[in-house]
From Swiss-Prot:
The protein, known as: Uncharacterized protein C03B1.1
Keyword annotations from UniProtKB, A to Z: Coiled coil
Coiled-coil portions: 1-38
Length: 260
């Protein structure tokens, strides 16, 4: 009997078994970590009360426009989820992109609004907070809970009232802000000769407000009403500049428009 051959085959079997066990342990570890993170919902009075970023948020909160930070945070989260989805194809991030582009941030509980605002304030990253919101939107997420106390999408909000009160004037305000943004990009393009602003001129000349997701519409309306800085608002829309056209708007598509 060839003992050397038998021993080598045995070693290969053991090595293969160890590799399978290692992969299984890594998979279990990943699942456990995701469950751990998903359970760590933002807790400003407990778990996160001593975070330096949270302390900085409370220090600044009376000196910033909270609606600006809410809308800006939702837009940044939409663009983050869209970017990750395009790279990974993950259903979580497709759901997230659909959620953050249209969901009314005022339907979130006060505690759930804070991380969104902190993203806009550059205190936290989109990557850090995204998993905390999956229970609000992802049917693929295994750890779903009843999150109605954290997010009640049926509640009538101030932003709903804003659209209702403005009526057809909402389109007028958006068109006025679009004109301001086009003039801003035109001036910056002539001053800096940057391609980004040249793309902006083309975009703002072509875009129709009715084809924009709701939070982008709110950005235009509130920017016009509240005099938000053009530079800040323009950056929110740059992801649209690379789109091949600005027509159409499917209700449940992560993309800002189609005809790509």
């Amino acid at each position: 009997m060839n003992w050397t051959r038998e021993i080598e085959q045995y070693k290969q079997v053991v090595a293969s078994y160890k590799l399978k066990m290692k992969r299984m342990e890594m998979k279990i570890s990943d699942i456990s970590e995701e469950k751990r993170q998903s359970s760590m919902l933002f807790d400003p009075a407990g778990t996160h009360s001593d975070d330096k970023e949270v302390c900085e948020y409370w220090r600044m909160i009376n000196y910033v426009d909270q609606n600006f930070n809410l809308i800006g945070g939702m837009i940044k989260m939409h663009q983050y989820c869209l970017s990750v989805y395009n790279k990974s194809g993950s259903g979580y991030f497709r759901d997230g992109a659909n959620f953050f582009r249209n969901a009314d941030p005022l339907n979130l509980s006060n505690d759930s609004k804070i991380p969104i605002q902190m993203v806009c304030m550059n205190l936290w990253t989109c990557e850090k907070i995204e998993i905390w919101y999956r229970d609000f939107y992802s049917h693929r997420y295994l750890e779903q809970v009843d999150g109605k106390e954290k997010y009640d999408e049926d509640q009538y909000t101030v932003f709903d009232q804003l659209f209702d009160n403005l009526g057809s004037d909402a389109s007028t305000l958006m068109e006025q802000q679009i004109e301001l943004m086009r003039n801003y990009c035109q001036a910056k393009a002539e001053l800096t000769n940057m391609v980004e602003f040249q793309r902006g001129v083309r975009f703002w000349r072509m875009v129709s407000p009715i084809h924009l997701p709701r939070n982008y519409q709110l950005a235009l309306i509130l920017a016009k009403r509240n005099g938000w800085v053009h530079e800040d608002v323009e950056r929110w829309f740059r992801v649209l500049y690379d789109e091949s056209c600005c027509v159409g708007a499917r209700g449940r598509d992560v993309y800002l428009n189609f005809g790509r």
